[in-house]
């Protein structure tokens, strides 16, 4: 009789341990070990930490030539050092396609081109409707360039992501797969709600 009681108690203890041990192990791994430390997360781009406040730069709309603000929307930014060559046109096209691929969320994303010269952009108005740009004619141009120059990881060939509050937060290398950028923006928009 005593062995039956002992056996049933051991079974009960075994069942309890099956549920308690995984909880204790996960608690230990999360709070007291280096488990997953240094994990880059699920983002495809490089997270800029700490974020860089860009303020509220006034930018021009490519088609209407009106001054607008980029705040309130996620913004994909890239630099054009000289004239807009084939690489520049490919980047304009790629960013337009990224925005369109977001479907119903495309209105939450803007595209910003930062040009180092005073180029006439009128030839691109039909192909890249809604594109924004900032160049030396803009009053906020020098301040924006200074903030980027202060960033140690500046890569003029990369694409950058600015959050709706005006903080530079992510960087995508020139040869990055646009699908990764789309996934990141979808996740950010979803988590913003």
Predicted regions located by residue number:
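Short, internal strand/loop/helix patches
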Residues: 110-116, 120-157, 162
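Short, Lys/Arg-rich N-terminal segment immediately upstream of the first membrane anchor
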Residues: 1-9
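Short, surface-exposed patches at the edges or C-terminal ends of soluble domains, predominantly
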Residues: 96-97, 101, 147-148, 187-193
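Short active-site neighborhood of thiol/selenol oxidoreductases, capturing the structured segment around
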Residues: 68-96
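Thiol-/selenol-based redox modules, centered on thioredoxin-like
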Residues: 155-193
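N-terminal "domain-start" segment that seeds a small globular fold
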Residues: 21-24, 32-68, 90
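Hydrophobic membrane-insertion alpha-helices, especially the h-region
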Residues: 10-30
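Conserved helix-turn-beta segment immediately C-terminal to the redox Cys motif
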Residues: 92-113
